């Protein structure tokens, strides 16, 4: 297929147009005074959302070159969302500012590679500054504040804080839709492993791309299963008592996987195959954890057991198993309570005796998975669009709260980024053009506060100047502007806080993608094919 090419300034301008379209749509949602965006759906009611990444993902532009710029900015939001689940709008605002300021410098003759190098040095200084001023999250009130800000709803904040306190920071919390209009919460014992289904054909819920099996039998082995003959005896025995079977193995492929998928599609058996978590000796230990939790037996040739010798008594049980592409959760394993407690005590003893920090960390993860619980938050609303919007906010708030517990908090409302600017004075540059990269980030770090003020109907420049003046007068770096009340004050005391991980990820991802965009010199895209018009019908033909 023939290609069309753009070079130099023309290429960068096309990318900028795409970046601006996405950023202008996304940044209107920033902050508690941010607006909603309504997204048309081919079927059903439109989706109304306050979530930056949801807006960004929906944008597809007709011009292929502009669309490249748009997709790069979508990547900023998506990457930030994947890592921390929040801060996507902040990352988008930062990236747009870096791109716009950077393109001015490049057009004026600065070297884009040196600008990028300056940006990379500057972002390291900002991240170090953010970490140095982080305040650890110690109590439930702090978690409630963080979650409430993310969701713009104090009820959601209190709910998430309560659930996190109940299951512990190592527990698993999932968000589901409720049939009622109020929030509901359920607590269940369970274990989550970081391996999902081997094939998407095992999915039972296409909307959520999840495989859900109720009351399944569970085969646990450390062997790779390629031949169906290996598991045929246990399959036949299992089919006499249930259709639901979960297989946890080193791998399932070839004929065995094909047979399971075909029989699943035919409805003969509702199977789910999951790869075993971990590697080496740790994998065997984790498989043994699953076996004890579910009351099954680990089938391993190391202990003289082959797959074809497995019986129904060797299979574990659980009330429910849920698997997506990344994780699998075993809910209410039917294992013996005394055996589970003994296993927990055994792991605790290993934690106390180990001298390796890495081993201690992995043992603590296993302990959390065995001892931790699973909480289900059910979100209710009066209408379908409101339900989806509220569910998005709860998911974001949950991710934000977890991030706060991990790395601590900083003052919110763009204050942390504003007060990190002096750290850029200490950045050592080798070449003159690297200074431009530092200058670009200096300006970009003001942009989130500027946009927050703009969304609240205020002049961003005036707000930033006032905040700086008050910080200097009162010698308090936590002073900022509360866009909800229109007051200036200590953001920590007002409960306006952001997790360090969210703020840090937003800056790092914005600089990463914007740097790539600034150093782009050529764009290549397919020339769209013109579809021939339909032929006109011949004379005398009756239609």
Swiss-Prot record:
Gene3D superfamilies (alphabetical): GroEL, GroEL-like equatorial domain, TCP-1-like chaperonin intermediate domain
EC annotation from Swiss-Prot or TrEMBL: 5.6.1.7
Gene Ontology MF term list: ATP binding; ATP-dependent protein folding chaperone; isomerase activity; unfolded protein binding
Keyword Hydrolase: no
Catalysed reactions listed for this entry: ATP + H2O + a folded polypeptide = ADP + phosphate + an unfolded polypeptide
Main subcellular location: cytoplasm
Record key words, sorted: ATP-binding, Chaperone, Cytoplasm, Isomerase, Nucleotide-binding
GO biological process, one term: protein refolding
Keyword Nucleotide-binding part of the UniProt annotation: yes
GO CC, alphabetical: cytoplasm
Localization, UniProt: Cytoplasm
Residues where ATP binds: 29-32, 86-90, 413, 482-484, 498
Subunit structure: Forms a cylinder of 14 subunits composed of two heptameric rings stacked back-to-back. Interacts with the co-chaperonin GroES.
Family affiliation: Belongs to the chaperonin (HSP60) family.
Function recorded in the entry: Together with its co-chaperonin GroES, plays an essential role in assisting protein folding. The GroEL-GroES system forms a nano-cage that allows encapsulation of the non-native substrate proteins and provides a physical environment optimized to promote and accelerate protein folding.
The protein, known as: Chaperonin GroEL 1
Organism listed in the record: Roseiflexus castenholzii (strain DSM 13941 / HLO8)
């Amino acid at each position: 297929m023939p290609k069309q090419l753009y070079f130099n300034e023309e290429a960068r301008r096309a990318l900028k147009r795409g970046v601006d379209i996405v950023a202008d749509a996304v940044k209107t949602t920033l902050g508690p005074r941010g607006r909603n965006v309504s997204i048309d759906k081919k079927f059903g009611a439109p989706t109304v959302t306050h979530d930056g990444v949801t807006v960004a993902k929906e944008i597809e532009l007709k011009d292929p070159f502009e669309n490249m710029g748009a997709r790069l900015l979508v990547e900023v939001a998506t990457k930030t969302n994947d890592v921390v689940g929040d801060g996507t709008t902040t990352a988008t605002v930062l990236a747009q500012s870096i791109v716009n300021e950077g393109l001015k410098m490049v057009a004026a003759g600065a070297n884009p590679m040196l600008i990028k190098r300056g940006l990379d040095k500057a972002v390291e200084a900002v991240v170090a500054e953010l970490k140095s001023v982080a305040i650890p999250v110690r109590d439930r009130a702090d978690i409630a504040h963080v979650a409430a800000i993310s969701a713009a709803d104090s009820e959601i904040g209190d709910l998430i804080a309560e659930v996190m306190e109940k299951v512990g920071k190592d527990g698993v919390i999932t968000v589901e839709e409720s049939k009622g209009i109020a929030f509901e919460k359920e607590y269940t014992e369970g274990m989550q492993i970081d391996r999902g289904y081997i094939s998407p054909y095992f999915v039972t819920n296409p909307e959520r791309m999840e495989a859900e099996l109720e009351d399944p039998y569970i085969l646990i082995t450390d062997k790779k299963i390629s031949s169906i003959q290996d598991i045929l005896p246990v399959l036949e025995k299992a089919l006499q008592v249930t259709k639901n079977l979960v297989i946890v193995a080193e791998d399932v492929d070839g004929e065995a996987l094909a047979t399971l998928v075909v029989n699943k599609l035919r409805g003969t058996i509702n199977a789910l195959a999951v790869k075993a978590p971990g590697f080496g000796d740790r994998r065997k230990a984790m498989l043994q954890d699953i076996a004890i939790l579910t009351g099954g037996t680990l089938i391993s040739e190391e202990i003289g057991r082959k797959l074809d010798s497995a019986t129904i008594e060797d299979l574990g049980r659980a009330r429910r198993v849920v698997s997506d592409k990344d994780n699998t959760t075993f809910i209410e394993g039917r294992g013996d309570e005394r055996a589970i407690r003994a296993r927990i005590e055994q792991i605790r003893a290993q934690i106390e005796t180990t001298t390796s920090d890495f081993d201690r960390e992995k043992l603590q993860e296993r302990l959390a998975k065995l001892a931790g619980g699973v909480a289900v938050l059910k979100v209710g609303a009066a209408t379908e669009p409101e339900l989806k919007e509220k569910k998005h906010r709860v998911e974001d708030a949950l991710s934000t709260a977890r991030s706060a517990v991990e790395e601590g908090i900083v003052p919110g409302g763009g204050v942390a980024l504003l007060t990190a600017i002096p750290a850029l004075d200490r950045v050592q540059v080798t070449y003159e053009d690297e200074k431009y990269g530092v200058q670009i980030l200096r300006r970009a770090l003001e942009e989130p506060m500027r946009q927050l003020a703009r969304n609240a109907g205020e002049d961003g420049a005036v707000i930033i100047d006032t905040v700086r003046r008050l910080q200097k007068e009162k010698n308090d770096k936590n002073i900022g502007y509360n866009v909800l009340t229109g007051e200036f004050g200590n953001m920590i005391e007002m409960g306006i806080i952001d997790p360090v991980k969210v703020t840090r990820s937003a800056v790092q991802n914005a600089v990463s993608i914007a740097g790539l965009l600034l150093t782009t010199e050529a764009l290549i895209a397919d020339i769209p094919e013109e579809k021939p018009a339909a032929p006109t019908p011949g004379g005398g033909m009756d239609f």
